[in-house]
Design a protein with these regions (language model features):
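Conserved beta1/A-loop at the N-terminus of ABC ATPase nucleotide-binding domains
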Residues: 392-402, 448
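Pre-Walker A (P-loop) beta-loop-beta motif of ABC nucleotide-binding domains
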Residues: 410-421
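Conserved small/polar residues in nucleotide/adenosyl-binding loops
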Residues: 454-455
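Walker A/P-loop
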Residues: 431
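The feature captures the beta-strand-to-loop junction immediately N-terminal to the Walker
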Residues: 423-425
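Helix-to-loop junction immediately C-terminal to a conserved catalytic motif
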Residues: 438
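Transmembrane alpha-helices and adjacent helix-loop boundaries
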Residues: 1-378
Length: 455
């Protein structure tokens, strides 16, 4: 365990040392710009991964948080002369508050409804940034001065090092947070919210906190984005950026800081692939070859179903055909990003880092630690009530959700030494009754509710 920890920490240090040293070996301004974007997208994707990877919610509002953070920093710099460190902190704090206010109503929704709510917020923010000309200069865009640090303007190389330093701080803070009690709560929320509630962890409270945290990191990344490009335009932070960010998290690997950085590199490089017809064609052919090999292998070994094997093959084949047919791939950006996202979600749900971790574990035959021996029944149930004793008694129990009466007028007596079953069709209130009895839901009405000890 200690050896593995040393290797992981050493790899993290090596990553940032190599990234920090690259500008000394790279003289191209274009390459330095890509490295700077990698650091900025890394901060944004670490924040998005909290919601998508750990909370299991499809968050389509991260592009809006980037936009709000960028404009907040830009306005603070142009009107009030705020330097870059304070602007990044203030933008992050502002978007944390905005994220919390959005999460309070939105997280009462689940699945597609939550995704639609966050996507609507992104569209609303883009419209507001475009229409509030007195504040944002509207469609004409907002010019931002060069970033200042302690009163001195930063050149491109110094700004890159600042971005890498911020990424390293975010990495360190998130690594410690995700290994703490809060991080374990985030991870449990994705797998089973009901079990998390049953263990006394406030599901809704932790979801709001996680969403706000991810939004704050998105705002901080937006501030860095503003100072990097020195120009902001409202339509930058719309659907296309939303899909690119989501693609970066999924393709890099969810629930992984390494995956966020890998995804950031892909996000930084992907738009540049579309600008070169030859590069995009080569990328499409390689993606199709990988999908074909993985799909056929999964079908032969029966480790995957036909849909998960064939759908990525069809999607990447469409990309290959498009790369030869389309005269200008830039015109098909949204369709290309959507096909890539579909291929990754279906064919590689664990992402590149998850796939690499699994492959390395198989290669080096890494075995998980042995589980402790099962406890004896006497340890789990040290005492038992005499047969016939009433342990649970309900009378007139009801639980309503608005006008829906999920449970209404239930009478029940559970005695020791007996086994009871709830029988009924879907939607008849079986799970709701168990949740009320276990304390997850408060009863709307009850005449008698008594839970007695077995002793």
């Amino acid at each position: 365990m200690l050896k593995r920890l040393i290797l992981v920490r050493g790899a993290e240090i090596a990553l940032f040392v190599v990234l920090g040293a690259l500008p000394l070996a790279v003289e191209s301004p274009y390459a330095l710009g890509l490295l700077t974007l990698l650091a900025i997208w890394g901060v944004a994707l670490i924040g998005l991964d909290v919601t998508v990877g750990y909370l299991g919610q499809i968050n389509l509002a991260q592009a809006a948080m980037l936009g709000l953070g960028a404009y907040f920093a830009g306005i603070a710099a142009t009107r009030y002369g705020v330097g870059i460190p304070l602007a990044v902190v203030l933008s992050g704090a502002f978007c944390t508050v905005v994220g919390a206010l959005l999460a309070l109503p939105a997280l009462r929704l689940e699945g597609p409804q939550f995704a639609l709510a966050t996507l609507s917020f992104t569209a609303l923010c883009a419209t507001a940034l475009n229409e509030l000309e007195w504040l944002t200069n509207g469609a004409q865009g907002l010019q931002i001065p060069r970033p200042l640090l302690l009163g001195h303007a930063l050149d491109a190389r110094a700004f890159f090092w600042l971005c890498i330093a911020i990424l390293a701080l975010v990495w360190l803070a998130m690594r410690n947070l995700l290994s703490s009690q809060w991080g374990r709560a985030f991870e449990a929320l994705r797998d089973s919210p009901i079990a998390t509630d049953a263990m006394g962890v406030g599901t809704y409270r932790h979801k709001v906190a996680g969403f706000a945290l991810g939004s704050g990191l998105g705002g901080a990344a937006g501030a860095l984005y503003a100072f990097n490009f020195s120009y902001l335009q409202p339509l930058t932070f719309v659907y296309e950026l939303t899909v690119i960010l989501l693609l970066g998290v999924v393709l890099g690997g969810r629930k992984s800081l390494w995956g966020a950085v890998v995804g950031a590199a892909l996000v930084a490089l992907l738009p540049n692939l579309l600008s070169s017809h030859l590069l995009f064609r080569a990328f499409s052919v390689i993606a199709f070859a990988l999908a074909l090999v993985a799909g056929v292998r999964g079908l032969v070994r029966r480790t995957t179903d036909a849909f998960r094997a064939l759908a990525p093959i069809a999607a990447t084949l469409t990309l290959v055909i498009g790369s030869f047919v389309a005269s200008n791939t830039e015109d098909w950006r949204k369709a290309i990003f959507a096909l890539l996202l579909f291929s990754v979600v279906v064919g590689l749900p664990e992402g590149l880092m998850g796939f690499a971790s699994t492959a390395l574990a198989r290669l080096f035959r890494v075995t998980p630690p042995e589980l402790p021996p099962p406890a004896a029944l006497e340890q789990v149930l040290p005492a038992r009530a005499p047969d016939g004793a009433v342990l649970l008694e309900l009378a007139g129990l009801a639980r309503h959700f608005g006008g829906v009466r999920a449970v209404d007028g239930v009478d029940l007596a559970v005695t020791a030494g007996t086994i009871h079953g709830l029988i009924g069709p879907n939607g008849s209130g079986k799970s709701t009754l168990v949740n009320v009895v276990s304390g997850l839901y408060a009863p709307t009405r009850r005449t008698l509710y008594e839970l007695r000890s077995e002793e």
